[in-house]
Amino acid sequence: DDRKAHYELYRECFQHIYAICRRYYINKDDCMSALNMVYYKIIKNISSYLSKSKDVPFELWTRKIAINYIIDEFRKNSRYKNLIEPTEVSVYENQMLIEDEFENTIDTEQIVEAVEKLPEMNRAVFNLYVIDGYKHEEIGKLLGISSSTSKVHLHRAKKTLRTLIDDVRKNDSISNKILS
């Protein structure tokens, strides 16, 4: 029964595809819409996977479909095209853009909340680079920007995250002093 098989496939894929979609979409309706479109693409292409891609783990195959769908949506939707002036890129080109990762003194939920507050393009580049492991050249091609612009967006994302996380730490410190 196809309906039962589709349901089982949906249950199998839901958690990891939802996690990918949540990283890129703040709005839960947009996230669920993307998740459903990704699921549709998985169903549509499952025969191709079964005949050609059996050597690739299923979760990796579905992850690639999800990320490709999200990137295609970024390309289609012009509101994600935060353009940067060429002079602004050159200021950052000669600086070290990849800074030390955040200390492990803040919990994951606070980091996720901070990432969700980033501007859309900064968040997309941050997710692609830090979470999904893409290189700047690949991100540039995927998003239709230069690798230098990708580096600028990553730099801005990390700088903003540091500020947001520092604010959380200060608030926690103040709360602890008040409660003591």
Q: Residue ranges of each PLM-predicted region?
A:
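Short amphipathic alpha-helical boundary/capping segments
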Residues: 110-119
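Internal acidic/polar
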Residues: 72, 80-108, 178
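A short, charge-rich alpha-helical start-of-domain segment used by transcription regulators
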Residues: 1-19
